[in-house]
Amino acid sequence: MFTMKLNNRTATKVNTELVDNRSIDFYVKSRHWLSNPNKSFFKLFGQVVESENRHQISPPSKVYDKVKDKVILIQQFYVDKIPHRHTENKFCLKQNVNNKFIDKIILLNEEIYTNEQLGLKTQSSKIQQINIKTRLTYKDVFYYINNLNLKGYIVLANTDIFLDDTIERVKQTGLSQERKVFCQLRHEYNGEKQLSSCTLHLNRPDTQDAWIWHTNSIVTPKQQEMFDYRMGKNGCDNKTVYVFSILGFACHNEPTIIKIYHNHTSQIRNYLNDGKIPGPYYSIHPFVSNMPPPNNLNTFDIVRENQTLHNYVLGKLEKNQVFIIPRIASVENNMAMYGNYYNNQNKDILNKIRAWAPTMKKNAGILLNSEAAAAKYSKLYLSAFNKCERYFSWEPWNNYVKHIPDSFDFILANFPKPKFDTLALDIFHSIPREPWTRALRGKRVLIISPFKESFESKVHIREKIYGIDLFPDCELSFIKPPQTQADNPSRPFDVELDEFMKRLYNIKDTFDIALCSCGGYGNLVCAGLFDMGKSAIYVGGVLQMYFGVYGQRWLRDRPDVFKLYRNDTWSRPKPSERPQGFASIEGGCYW
């Protein structure tokens, strides 16, 4: 491997076979599991696998009546000092100039190039060069779309990408009517005489080299700030899927509908030594019609998951049907599995119960003073999964699941029911759409949370937190659950639980549904409320973000959300809402 300085860009000659082989196993197997999750994800891999990306399979598009707006291609052209690489880039530009279905090409360059440098014999009326004097960012693209008053279908593509006649199909994809973006996987062009011979880049099916949307989908100046990172930098494609998603775009990757071609036989890379854009990252695997359809219980698509949750809750409430939605927790899930096996008198199980008991007290607030108490906790925890129709589950490569792979499989195997993606509860990702909580319209909603005082102080300004009211026409009430985590004192968990359930029973006629955030008591409280004839949803720690009460976890993991929504109504929890030793709970993640 060697490096060289090229036109202010560091290029690296790489063994791409090695790079692809390091990643291909995960992408092939995760695609297989997404398409047909008929066995344990971990057994498929033979190990616990973690990915920093969320993975989903693209939905298919419908065919719409043709809307004949202009197709505008935006790229940044540059002159590479490696002749072979420069020839590849010139070839792509020439192909795009000759494409009769591309109406305009905007080149946002670091300098203005001559026709010879562009690889053109004569000036093309299609091309407009603008000297932006720097490497192109996605934010720049939106600025120039507005500045040039561009209207129509925008195709943003890397320099080494060219399109064929299938770009005409974009006019029947509904982009002008819907807030939707195509994030397209490429075909590899290696000098083939017939483009039909080019194959998809299935070694990394989650990558994108072109993004297509319509200017009717407005991106506000504040939203444009979310795209303030360079094109071509490592991770930019998966970051862009995430940003489009949280701005309300339905993301599609349909490479056989609209084809893009990658001309890169030189294998010169300009980003491998350039760091990586900070996450989160979304990987959208392509929809290919001749592959098995994704299992509808495992879409992991925030648009579809939010809508499915919204519709389920709305349907239940409209029919006055009592329901609960528990969730797979973390350390509590492990304890539920170990406690379930307690009667076997297995020494290994007994040792694990004893080993996990301190963490149960510290993180989940559950004091287990004997192995028999663990068995009782397990029975109550698992009863929630028996009583529900659906429950929340993590994607199996999630950072949380690596700590609970056995108990994760235990729940899925013993409760083969439809699931919601737990991250559908991240309400801040669904603000531009119809957040699932709006299905609660007009209901009496009980909020169970340790941040009762903080929430109560924001009821009258709740529509300012995200710019919409997450609980329209709702009558909100609040109750604080047992505060027994960290160094706070606690009685045995069942004593704390019984006392709290009596408090809930005494007010059961004052609410229609409860949203729960109460540590290790969450699933147990949901099950108990169901027995009272009340509905409940175990939302978990993220419930505090519904009221703009944030902690370290969201500052760390969701910086884009803060950039987009944070305002003077947001706050930390009140000092009185911190348990003793709160910093010992995942670094004080809730505070």
Predicted segments, located by residue:
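Short beta-strand-to-loop acidic/aromatic patch adjacent to the donor-nucleotide binding site
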Residues: K151-D164
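C-terminal functional extensions of proteins
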Residues: L524-W591
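Conserved catalytic core of nucleotide-sugar-dependent glycosyltransferases
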Residues: I161-Y242
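Short, acidic, metal-binding catalytic loop of nucleotide-sugar glycosyltransferases
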Residues: F91-I102
